[in-house]
A protein has these predicted regions:
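Conserved small/polar residues in nucleotide/adenosyl-binding loops
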Residues: 186-191
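Helix-coil modules at protein/domain termini and other flexible surface or pore-lining loops
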Residues: 1-185
């Protein structure tokens, strides 16, 4: 399942930072790590390197976009909610974003996430409430928002995972650090030459 934007996406003069909401479930994991990996593959993040981000604010210029394929090995920022279940148990995970306006008229965007052992509807309601609290505590006016929630029931004697993510594939490029997808390697010969 995937979801993106409500069509009323935030605009910012600082440039664009594309992102999208995705969900996935896996109910047949041999263990929690196996279920987690299956969920990442299902969500399209199985071949990416992830930086899981905490905090409420999204990069300036956030814009909801349709999902895009990610190159193998790419470094991707994401706000990830992961909830586990075992042996017939149920788990839910959700992520939401909101485009906002400050009292001074500046545009920004925030994110909220949640994990529960409740059903889909209850989890979605709690997620929306968490998003409202984040808006209220910062005195922000909502312009538009979107949510993504998924629910899993683990198979008998197996682990299950419900995952929801806001994926921001280009946010790390915006930091001025250039290409963060490569690394510099020194061979032992190069290290000897520098010594």
């Amino acid at each position: 399942c995937n979801m993106f934007g409500s069509g009323n996406t935030p605009k910012s003069p600082t440039g664009s930072c594309p992102g999208w909401l995705m969900t996935a479930v896996a109910s047949w994991g041999e263990n929690a790590e196996d279920a987690y990996d299956q969920g990442l593959v299902e969500m399209g993040l199985g071949d990416s390197r992830l930086i899981e981000v905490q905090g409420a604010f999204l990069p300036m210029g956030f814009e909801a976009t349709p999902p895009m394929p990610l190159p193998m090995g790419s470094l991707v920022e994401c706000h990830l909610a992961t909830s586990y279940a075992y042996n017939g148990g149920t788990a839910c995970a959700g992520v939401a974003w909101a485009a906002c306006r400050t009292p001074e008229g500046e545009e920004c965007a925030i994110v909220a996430k949640i994990t529960t052992e409740l059903d889909y509807e209850e989890t979605e309601a709690l997620l929306k409430r968490n998003l409202q609290r984040r808006l209220a505590s910062r005195d922000l006016e909502v312009v538009s928002f979107d949510v993504a929630v998924d629910e899993v029931t683990a198979a008998q004697d197996h682990f299950g995972v419900a995952m929801a993510a806001l994926i921001l594939p280009e946010s790390l490029k915006m930091s001025g650090g250039g290409n963060v997808g490569s690394c510099l390697l020194y061979t032992s010969d190069a290290a000897d030459d520098q010594a």
